[in-house]
């Protein structure tokens, strides 16, 4: 049993603190009341106690008069100390120290004996455990040897069984005549049956020919096809895309069977159609085979593996994205930080492109990315969240948390990047910051002063209040997270924006994320590639190179890439062309697969859409990101009755080719921040093509909504204006059947729509042809008045029927 300081203090009749002090004086530190005391430490403790007891006996002498102690002082004088007499007897006082010393000695001896006994028990347990381990090891070795012997015996038995048929065959072969032995050895299975082996001119005897014929028949029967007893299960490796015929070959089945399974799954395909990996795996499992998803190593994968950055990483500036709802002051806040006036140059005062800038703050460089807040630019915000290190979520203090604020929070949480909330417009009156914090907390964005981990800083983009605190928070976050990247390597990055600019060509805004981008490098972005001809920073300065976290404009690509495409620098133009061609081929294959995936479904959809009105649109925008956002927004306007179809989209001005395509497809041409040239305008006038120009995205969307609303069928509603009950029916050769009625409710008007009800069931619906009061034709009859009603093209009216007079009202519908 291991002793602790607590148990030893009870044995020694001392406090735990005294025992700890004695151990510390003896050189054993770091003990507390629950610390275990080893045997060696117990010996040290006992030794210290013995020394203390002996020193006390030598220093003190007990007498009836008190305690005397003598010691030599520095001057050699003797000092005598007398203890005050106690009320107890002198005998008890003299015996007390001796009793204490004896008790200590006894306790020490007991503790030492207990320690020795514990050590002996531990040694005995260790010896017993070692003996058990040795026995287990011996038993395991014996068992292993027995298993090995059994396996050898089984193997010998199998060999004997395998040799037995061979011996029987050999015995049978030996019993045959010599001329018939070994006639079927080797590959000579087509030996002539009626010719002797050694003499071709001599025929075999009839008996020998019969035996040889039987042997050949047996041999042929052994090699004949036999139907499998159990179904053969294949393991099918399936790539990302596979043809139906190829899949059937891998499963060793007919292509028609595969088509039947596909049809049962609701997929209409032909033999040469390409299906995706998931569909193919379902088909394989449905047909009883095992499917394995195989990932082919493509040219692109090999290139990316080769370009993986390796080397010493160095600190880089943080990339900060500003996100939030439209008109919450994102660009205005960035303007104050940059001391610029960007919002003055934006149409409608809202951001419609991704802007990237670098700012110096207290000697530190920070890269800012400004994103649009309009709902149509959701993809832009998503791309920015994935390309950033820190997100500044701007929330207007007077407006609170809005839909795009919540959407931005979801993008940030999906990307897993740190977030700082800037509560803007605190210079306005009547704001409630705590309410904003409470609403944000419902979306798992909890302020630090509420026990969360998100810094929330009140700022004003108008007065500049709190901006310094916001910059300090960014610098602190960057210092804690230690953002770094490899500098000396081929550059990698992300396309932020791309456009076609007159006089400059294809201009691509990229964010360098690792490596160094140099002028003259071979760059690939999406489907486009080319040599870097010029690098320009956010201030318009031409650079020779760009390092990580720098946003730059690059000239030299073969086309305009899509926003969000990965940028790679390769060592040769041949490799760049090879990767670009591979990506284009893969994209064409995906588009073809998409078109051929369900032809029957498309056919049925077209039949259903025969009554659907369609607005064809040809869209041209200034940058690729805006074009993508507009396409998504326009297609989102489609309903069951009216839809928008973007027949073509692109970047750059509107040209003559666009007008020709619009005339052919009867499309409306929409230009976003672009204009048509003179030739295009003339062609549009001749062809009757309508061109609309826009600089604000929601104006474009509202106009398209208005056009679609004009295509919607009006909403019809019915208004009952009167009810009359039929009292009698008069027959007239000239007028036909006339119903004598009493108007019970409302007004009955001539030339109105009516319903004839019998027992509350509609039996006829038509027009009220004639209305008479006595012999006079009247236009209307009010409630409580008798009248005669003639119904157009209906002669089965009877007394007791009800005539319901109503009108239909058309209302124009809007989206």
Curated annotation (Swiss-Prot):
Renumbered residue ranges of the record's region G5: 460-462
One term under GO cellular component: cytosol
Residues holding GTP: 324-331, 370-374, 424-427
InterPro entries xref list: EF-G-like_DII, IF2_II, IF2_N, P-loop_NTPase, Small_GTP-bd, T_Tr_GTP-bd_dom, TF_IF2_bacterial-like, TIF_IF2
Region ranges (G4): 424-427
Subcellular location, record wording: Cytoplasm
GO molecular function terms attached to this record: GTP binding; GTPase activity; translation initiation factor activity
Predominant place of localization: cytoplasm
Alphabetical UniProt keywords: Cytoplasm, GTP-binding, Initiation factor, Nucleotide-binding, Protein biosynthesis
PROSITE patterns: G_TR_2, IF2
All copies of domain tr-type G, residue ranges: 315-482
Residue span of region G2: 349-353
Pfam families reported in the protein's UniProt record: EF-G_D2 (PF22042), GTP_EFTU (PF00009), IF-2 (PF11987), IF2_N (PF04760)
Function description: One of the essential components for the initiation of protein synthesis. Protects formylmethionyl-tRNA from spontaneous hydrolysis and promotes its binding to the 30S ribosomal subunits. Also involved in the hydrolysis of GTP during the formation of the 70S ribosomal complex.
Family matches, as HAMAP family: IF_2_B (MF_00100_B)
Record-linked NCBIfam families: IF-2 (TIGR00487), small_GTP (TIGR00231)
Family per record: Belongs to the TRAFAC class translation factor GTPase superfamily. Classic translation factor GTPase family. IF-2 subfamily.
Protein name as annotated: Translation initiation factor IF-2
Organism: Ruthia magnifica subsp. Calyptogena magnifica
Organism ancestry: Bacteria, Pseudomonadati, Pseudomonadota, Gammaproteobacteria, Candidatus Pseudothioglobaceae
